[in-house]
Amino acid sequence: MAVLLETTLGDVVIDLYTEERPRACLNFLKLCKIKYYNYCLIHNVQRDFIIQTGDPTGTGRGGESIFGQLYGDQASFFEAEKVPRIKHKKKGTVSMVNNGSDQHGSQFLITTGENLDYLDGVHTVFGEVTEGMDIVKKINETFVDKDFVPYQDIRINHTVILDDPFDDPPDLLIPDRSPEPTKEQLDSGRIGADEEIDDFKGRSAEEVEEIKAEKEAKTQAILLEMVGDLPDADIKPPENVLFVCKLNPVTTDEDLEIIFSRFGPIRSCEVIRDWKTGESLCYAFIEFEKEEDCEKAFFKMDNVLIDDRRIHVDFSQSVAKVKWKGKGGKYTKSDFKEYEKEQDKPANLVLKEKVKPKQDAKYDLILDEQGEDSKSSHSHTSKKHKKKTRHCSEEKEDEEYMPIKNPNQDIYREMGFGHYEEEESCWEKQKNEKRDRRQNRSRSRSRERDGHYSNSHKPKYQTEPYERERSRKRDRSRSPKKSKAKEKSKYR
């Protein structure tokens, strides 16, 4: 109960579960017997997931079962066998592909991943790969496009039945030999299965090494661009800049400019120094106005003795100061010096020796002579202040009890929902009543306070006549006999 698949990459042997899946195995064996799978494309390769094939059209939407070959289009698909349940646990599991309605045709898949539980109950497992897992691994690692179709054709060239326990149906037409492929089958619009992809064919070993070196340099440039060390992968260093190294630490910019200026005008000459200590790093960059002058200096000045040092001159490979598509450009020594100067500047903020006491702008200092008058004025102003604070507190309370306004309130009012207007009127009434209560309370309290204040703060010369009047009233209210006796006693 096994079938050998001869592919363009190698042979694969599949063992079938004929006892657990008799109908699916019968369908697969008889399709192999009539050479239905010959020259079928492997049209779906999803790495570490599945390899799908079995469609003669190569689109993934075709194919029919052996029963369709025998009984017509009404039998193109057969029902899936779900009992007993076999899971997609290991690599190399072979399953019939579900057409979307729990039916199978001719397409099947081989798993290239483990524990694919989401395939269980959807696609019917009917076998496993026992030989040729290395070929399955090769197919799994092939290059594919966005639709998971391989760029180079991978086909099933031939199928060989190693063991078939099922009898052939009476109307089954078995060909004597394998049929030849048609042009439509072989023309997939992609790289042919028998085509060799060799970029180095017909080239010498030196040319091959040069091509490899160029590819490696390009890869490294792209990597440096991704990291951020290069502004662009296609950028080239300037051809009018020389790199001079092995300098004496005492050599200055002016010395180098004077020496190299005999080859032509120089735009800039800079000895690179440590931005902290200012000491020379013993290398420099010299930029000429013309490339010809730069080439002359390169050939003439290499290994020349300057300040008791043999210098080395080469073309600069640095692109640090090159502006390219809005990128590039680095901080220079002068930038760091300016930054240090800004840091060394004294701050504008100054600490004060004493903190000024907080004073109210409405009140001034009071002299000792005006102590009594100040007390009365202070009490009067404090009353005003209390009244103001009370008024502010009332306004705050009104604000605190204000309801949260619905942003859709105006829209609802226009649409005719009147309950919002009723709620507003009720709220205004309640608000006015509360305000009246507060005002009445404040008035009564102020009256009581004013009466108490007037009685307690009246001077003595105002209280004496008041007491005399009260005594007179008392005398009048008494009986006339007693009053006459009192008068007589006065004149005795």
Swiss-Prot record:
The entry's keywords: Isomerase, Isopeptide bond, Nucleus, Phosphoprotein, RNA-binding, Rotamase, Ubl conjugation
Its EC number is: 5.2.1.8
Class of the enzyme per the UniProt entry, highest EC level:
isomerase
Q: According to the UniProt entry, which residue ranges have a biased composition of type Basic residues? A: 377-390, 473-485
The chain residues annotated with the modification Phosphothreonine are: 182
SUPFAM superfamilies given in the database record: Cyclophilin-like, RNA-binding domain, RBD
Looking at the record's lineage, which domain of life comes first?
Eukaryota
| Record-level GO cellular component terms | cytosol; nucleoplasm
Residues modified as Phosphoserine are: 178, 393, 471
Per UniProt, subcellular location reads as: Nucleus
Q: Where is the RRM domain?
A: 240-318
Q: Does the keyword Lipoprotein apply?
A: no
Note the position of the cross-link Glycyl lysine isopeptide (Lys-Gly) (interchain with G-Cter in SUMO2): 201, 212, 218, 321, 362, 405, 460
In which residue ranges is the amino acid composition biased (Basic and acidic residues)? 177-187, 426-436
Q: Which residues form the PPIase cyclophilin-type domain?
A: 1-161
Region annotation Disordered: where it falls in the sequence: 167-188, 368-409, 423-492
Q: Which reaction does it catalyse?
A: [protein]-peptidylproline (omega=180) = [protein]-peptidylproline (omega=0)
List the Gene Ontology MF annotations in alphabetical order. Answer: peptidyl-prolyl cis-trans isomerase activity; RNA binding
What is the role of the protein in this entry? PPIases accelerate the folding of proteins. It catalyzes the cis-trans isomerization of proline imidic peptide bonds in oligopeptides.
Q: Which family, according to UniProt?
A: Belongs to the cyclophilin-type PPIase family. PPIL4 subfamily.
Q: What is this protein called?
A: Peptidyl-prolyl cis-trans isomerase-like 4
Give the gene symbol. Answer: Ppil4
